[in-house]
Amino acid sequence: MVYSVGLTGNIASGKSTVAEFFSELGINVIYADKIAKELTSKDTPCYQDIILHFGSSVVLNNGELDRKHIRDIIFSNSNERLWLESLLHPVIRKKIEEQLIVCTSPYCLIEIPLLFNKHHYPYLQKVLLVIAPLESQLDRIVKRDHCTKKQALAILATQPNLEQRLEAADDVLINESGLSELKAKVNKLHQKYLREAKIKQ
């Protein structure tokens, strides 16, 4: 199977921008969140399980899941978050594996927001952690989710702590300057992963 790098980091750390930079370099990127969205689209088995568990309050008028409402529930209740993770994560892992088989680039990048146990993803050779200063994260969450700073802090509080993240990481990318510096750091890592992927072959 192709050499694989897991890309992770707390919410609003700049993961998606980093993933875009790798994509611009010709690297196939698999998005765990996108897979999760597809798995929970209308009338799928996971969609049915979620409605059975949470009730009709999580369904919009058009029949789609009210993702914002579900997000609010799981951010305020760790048991509900764990239930949802235990439902989705095994299926997401399987789908990632299927996509890796058809990967055409020298190595593959997999964006997995909640990656703090490498053993759950045995096909990963490396884990790249993106971290950003707290204030930057808060600003991004407030702008993106149109929420208050207090709500943004509550969202961040549900994320794995940095120590947990660092334990799983092989490489750490600090996103604290502008985009050009971030791009330069990605280019450097890209060269490193190309070398490592070549050695693996």
Swiss-Prot record:
UniProt KW keywords: ATP-binding, Coenzyme A biosynthesis, Cytoplasm, Kinase, Nucleotide-binding, Transferase
Transmembrane regions: none
Residue ranges of every copy of the DPCK domain listed in the record: 4-201
Bridged cysteine pairs (disulfide): none
Nucleotide-binding as UniProt keyword: yes
Any one GO MF annotation of this record: dephospho-CoA kinase activity
GO biological process: coenzyme A biosynthetic process
GO cellular-component term (any): cytoplasm
Residues noted as binding ATP in the record, renumbered to the chain: 12-17
The enzyme's E.C. designation: 2.7.1.24
Involved pathway(s): Cofactor biosynthesis; coenzyme A biosynthesis; CoA from (R)-pantothenate: step 5/5
Pfam families listed in its UniProt record: CoaE
SUPFAM superfamilies: P-loop containing nucleoside triphosphate hydrolases
Recorded catalytic activity of this chain's protein: 3'-dephospho-CoA + ATP = ADP + CoA + H(+)
InterPro entries attached to this UniProt entry: Depp_CoAkinase, P-loop_NTPase
Main subcellular localisation: cytoplasm
Enzyme superclass (EC): transferase
Subcellular location: Cytoplasm
NCBIfam families found in the cross-reference section: dephospho-CoA kinase
Job description of the protein: Catalyzes the phosphorylation of the 3'-hydroxyl group of dephosphocoenzyme A to form coenzyme A.
Family recorded in the similarity comment: Belongs to the CoaE family.
Protein name (record): Dephospho-CoA kinase
Name of the gene this protein is made from: coaE
